Swiss-Prot record:
Could be a mediator in iron transactions between iron acquisition and iron-requiring processes, such as synthesis and/or repair of Fe-S clusters in biosynthetic enzymes. It comes from Glaesserella parasuis serovar 5 (strain SH0165) (Haemophilus parasuis). NCBIfam families: PRK05408.1. The keyword Plastid does not apply. GO terms for molecular function: iron ion binding. This is Probable Fe(2+)-trafficking protein. The keyword Ribosomal protein does not apply. One of its GO terms (biological process) is cellular response to oxidative stress. HAMAP family: Fe_traffic_YggX. The lineage of its organism: Bacteria, Pseudomonadati, Pseudomonadota, Gammaproteobacteria, Pasteurellales. Keywords: Iron. PANTHER family: FE(2+)-TRAFFICKING PROTEIN-RELATED (PTHR36965:SF1). GO terms for cellular component: cytosol. It holds the Pfam family Iron_traffic. Belongs to the Fe(2+)-trafficking protein family.
Length: 91
């Protein structure tokens, strides 16, 4: 049976994650208040960030940057800025 959470990103009730995907207290916070849909949106942004900024996940500074962007995106409603990226307009 799916578990529902009040998603901090979507600001509505939605299907929650199946298990904790990120370690520590932040991981618990994500598990308790981020939906599958919001997490999928973050993964898209994360992939773009890693590729465009050429981030190396072995570098602690790059991991910290990604974590900061994740918190800003999921909990503070801040859009991820990727230089040169222009979203395709929906028709």
């Amino acid at each position: 049976m799916a578990r529902n959470v009040f998603c901090a990103y979507l600001k509505q009730e939605a299907e929650g994650l199946d298990f904790q995907l990120y370690p520590g207290e932040l991981g618990k916070r994500i598990f308790d208040s981020i939906s599958k849909q919001a997490w999928a949106e973050w993964i898209k942004k994360q992939t773009m960030l890693v590729n465009e900024k050429k981030l190396n996940m072995m570098n602690p500074e790059h991991r910290q940057l990604l974590e900061t962007e994740m918190v800003n995106f999921l909990f503070e409603g801040k859009e991820v800025h990727i230089e040169g990226y222009v979203p395709v307009e929906s028709k």
